[in-house]
Structures are given as structure tokens and as C-alpha cells.
Design a protein with these regions (language model features):
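C-terminal flanking helix
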Residues: 117-126
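N-terminal interaction/assembly modules
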Residues: 1-75, 99, 128-130
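Short amphipathic alpha helix immediately N-terminal
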Residues: 78-95
């Protein structure tokens, strides 16, 4: 996944939303129905809990989304204050580059250059995912 799309998903809240949806999918998996409606139950007392824990541990999709979220948060913590502001204005508030530049008192070109450098740095954080 491209680093710019990861930032868009993070700032729009889609990344956190995907994590919550995946947790719900794991907590309440779809029940397969057969024509006879026979329910096979296991006698183990802790089995539902055990299944839930194992499915969460083994779920690669959820782990990938959570790692992506942690990587973005760590990346943003380590960024300079002005770079955080540029990303916030660009992705959270969806400002055009001219308005971002006016807000941080840099030229439009400098903001774009810093943004491009940030995307390269973020892609290094996310490199192990791909």
C-alpha cells in the first residue's frame, strides 16, 4: 500500500475503522447454515473463548492493520512539529498546498518537497509490510 494512501486512511479515520470492523468480524463470525439445521456443539467449556483468542492471534489481516497504525503513529511522533502540521493540514483538513503553505509560513514548493520527503520516510517505516 502506498504511503500517501496510508496517511489518508489514518487521518480520515478509515484505518481505525477497518481495525474495529475486523475485530467485530472475528468476534462474531458468520455462521454457516446447512439445509438440515443441525448444530454441532463441542463439549469443551472454554472453547468459544479459546476460539476467539486463537482467531485474533492468528488473524493476519488484523495484525497487519494494527502494525500499520502503530507505524504511522510512531512516524508522526518522530516527525518535526512543522511536518506534523503539514500532514495534518493536508490530510485531516484537506487543505490545498497554497493554504498549507500560508499556515506554516513556508513556500508552496517547500511544503510539497517536505511532504514528498515525509512520504519517502514513511515508506521506510512501512517497507516490511510489502
Amino acid at each position: 500500500m502506498r504511503s500517501e494512501q496510508v496517511l489518508k486512511d489514518y487521518y480520515s479515520g478509515k484505518l481505525a475503522q477497518r481495525i474495529q470492523l475486523r475485530k467485530l468480524e472475528l468476534a462474531y463470525p458468520p455462521q454457516p447454515e446447512n439445509e438440515v439445521k443441525i448444530r454441532v456443539s463441542e463439549s469443551s467449556v472454554g472453547d468459544p473463548t479459546e476460539r476467539e483468542v486463537l482467531s485474533r492471534v492468528m488473524d493476519l489481516r488484523l495484525a497487519t492493520l494494527e502494525r500499520r497504525l502503530m507505524c504511522v503513529e510512531k512516524f508522526l511522533r518522530e516527525c518535526e512539529r512543522v511536518d506534523q502540521r503539514i500532514l495534518h493540514l493536508r490530510y485531516r483538513k484537506e487543505y490545498q498546498w497554497v493554504k498549507v503553505a500560508m499556515d506554516v509560513n513556508y513556500s508552496r514548493r517547500t511544503c510539497i518537497r517536505r511532504h514528498n520527503n515525509l512520504l519517502i520516510e514513511l515508506s521506510k517505516y512501512l517497507a516490511w509490510e510489502e
